Amino acid sequence: MDLRSELFELSMSEQAQPLMDAVQIHIRDNVDPITEEFFRLNDEKQDRWSWHPRQLELLDGAKNKAKDIGLWNFFLPESDMGAGVNNLDYAYIAAELGKSPLASETLNCSAPDTGNMEVLERVGTPEQKDKWLTPLLNGEIRSAFAMTEPGVASSDAKNISTSAVLKNGEWVINGEKYYISGAGDPRCKIMITMVKTSPDAPPAKQQSQILVPIDTPGVEIVEGMRVFGQDHAPKGHMHIRFNDVRVPEENMLLGEGRG
């Protein structure tokens, strides 16, 4: 097949069809039967920003069933930590998962965890991988990606103003973030946080990414913000302030100015 033909060949591969079949069976047998009860339990919680124990029991049961048959971590195509599914085939599987509000999490394929795990797998140190990537890959914790800021077009990282200054072996972080998806989830333990570390460098080399445990002193979760009128509790889209947040120097990802 020449390059032009290859570029226009966007069908799911034959090799992925058995996997797609297994995903559909998993959703039918293990996800659909728990969905109604899962969301009904929202009405029994005293705190909207928490999970009902039964909700976590239902999720963990479906996750364990998926993991037992290898339906797990589809999003790392070139890593022995993933299922070896290429991006095109994964796109078809993701479309199938999107038909259910719970399916992607039961296969450990939910954002923002998927993107965060890819970053850690590619550029994390052995220590960072052991502390954060392993429990994420196992579906034991959740994570967030803290980039968006108030008042600026935050998809352009050059607009980020949250600062991180190195003092006595620690990064001291100050700033404010908006719409940080998943940061309200009680299971969220770590945030990959976009900061400005090198304000005097060329614009494209001023930004860095730092691992910030969400329970670090100075991390202030102000409120859940609304998207199209919904706050999506308990995962949420959170307004967060960083008030002299201190994390070890080794929490930097890849290197200063390489965010």
Name the predicted role of every residue range:
Residues 1-111, 122, 127-131, 135:
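Amphipathic, small/basic residue-rich leader segments at the start of a protein or domain
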Residues 70, 93-99, 194-196, 212-217, ...:
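Short Ser/Thr-interspersed hydrophobic loop/turn segments at strand-loop and sheet-helix junctions
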Residues 117-123, 145-146, 200:
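Flexible, glycine-rich active-site loops centered on histidine and acidic residues
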Residues 139-148:
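A short, Trp-centered hydrophobic/proline-enriched beta-strand micro-motif
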Residues 151-155, 182-186, 199-201, 228-236:
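Short Gly/Pro-enriched turn/cap motifs at secondary-structure boundaries
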Residues 162-165:
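A structural signal for short hydrophobic beta-strand segments in well-ordered beta-sheet cores
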Residues 169-170, 174-222:
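A short core secondary-structure module
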Residues 214-259:
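A glycine-rich, basic-preceded beta-loop-alpha segment at the flavin cofactor/substrate interface
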